[in-house]
Structure formats: structure tokens, C-alpha cells
Amino acid sequence: MRGGLKVLSGAQVVDILADFGFAVIGGTKHIKLRRYGPNGNETLVVPNHSPITKGTLRVIFSQASHYVPQAELHPHFYND
């Protein structure tokens, strides 16, 4: 069974996604990240909040899992 979501800030999520090859391409209140994958541009938007609400964090995890395998993302977003 999965543990609950971690409490993360926007900056922490940006750092996590950077580890998977995403780079900041702009934004202040909402940070836009992009990487170039085998199917073209892969873009994510992360609110620059501290902390990010649980619902928003779930959505970011879900969107990121379109580009990065959930098994690799899970330890960064969830407590076990």
C-alpha cells in the first residue's frame, strides 16, 4: 500500500523534475519546465507555492508520470 504524499514546495518539485531532465524555461508564480523526449517536447507547469496543496501535487505527479515512469517518481512524491 502506498504512503501519503510528501509535503513539497514548488522549488522542491522543480528540483525533482530537473533530476529527470526537465529544465526551467520561464515563469514566476507558475514555473514552466520542459525537456525534449522521443516524442517531442514534454512540458510541465509547477506552481511556485510553499507548500503545494495535496490535490495539486497529485495532479503534478499524474502529469509527470506521462513522461517519467511512476515507479521512478513515486519515492520523490510519496512517503512509504
Where are these regions (language model features)?
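A short, structured beta-strand/loop element
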Residues: 23-59
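N-terminal first-folded block
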Residues: 1-26
